[in-house]
Amino acid sequence: MIIAHRGISFDLPENSLSAFNASWAVGVDGIEGDFHLTRDGSIVCIHDDNTSRVCNKNLVICNSTLQELKELNLQCEGKDHLNIKIPTLTEVLKIVPSGKKIFIEIKCGVEILSPLIKELSRSKINSTQVVIISFDRQVVKELKEMAPEYKALLLYSYKEGREVSSLINEMFDIKADGIGTDNELSKEFVEKVIISGLEYHSWTIDNADTANQLISWGSNSITTNEPELLIQ
């Protein structure tokens, strides 16, 4: 599977509906977006915990209401895109086609899980279309306890150098369905993960040769900033 990292965002704001729709247009298998919880309990799609990098005003997400965030225009390369707003999870879910995937990266803590599960259950999205991902083991653990029907992956930087067996044991302890890592890893690492019965997913891969190598090793998905290149 080829997954568009924050959508296609070279000339469109990242994590915007426009960037996600551009991804569907080139034939990706899924999109990856980042999500935070607002002060008034809405779930919004934005990578950072504040708006300074992607808007012309700095608001902290968890201290802001949805209405306050919706007043901002998203930027790309320092330029405002008029009427391109920070989307809600509801808005993103509505544009996911049948049979396609959405990788939901949780960028805050476990406080998002209850509203997230409610939002997913109200949407047209089938549970098989959803993959929840997080660097926070507690988020993965509690998600699987609350809603085991959703696939959940623990994100991990291979450069941390941890023993594969220890990492696999942790995956089973928190009931994760698999692991997502960067691409600086060995074939042995991937094989051990897969042999254990866990899924292996790769991020963020923008080179076709690297992507093909990881696929040949058994990677279930490739998350990329260059979906058009990898689809060719």
PLM-predicted stretches and their roles:
Residues 1-232:
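Phosphate-group recognition and catalysis centered on beta-loop-alpha active-site segments
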